[in-house]
A protein has these predicted regions:
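Surface-exposed, low-hydrophobicity beta-strand/loop segments enriched in small/polar/acidic residues
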Residues: 1-91
Length: 91
């Protein structure tokens, strides 16, 4: 897949404005358990991905989505709880 871009967040916010496919994410957890929720259509949009993260200030997780990626028709918004940072690869 060509034309990929990356975006790093350290708190809740917009990953990208406009349609995109998320192909990978890499996160660094916080000292207590947390979560990542990805929505299409802003903070109150439709949840397309949700995961819990265990406690661990040095915890890292790498998530690969399938070849098609996770499609966001409108935009991609991330709600982060107890996440130090998260990097998205999208295009």
């Amino acid at each position: 897949m060509f034309g990929l871009k990356s975006k790093t967040l350290t708190g809740t916010g917009s990953v990208v404005s406009g349609p995109t496919r998320l192909v990978k994410l890499y996160l660094v957890g916080g000292s207590s358990a947390g979560s990542v929720v990805l929505k299409n259509g802003g903070a109150s949009g439709t949840t397309l991905f949700e995961m819990a993260t265990p406690a661990g200030a040095t915890l890292t997780q790498n998530i690969d989505f399938n070849d098609e990626g996770l499609r966001f028709e409108t935009d991609c918004h991330a709600t982060l709880t107890n996440i130090t940072s998260i990097t998205f690869l999208h295009g």
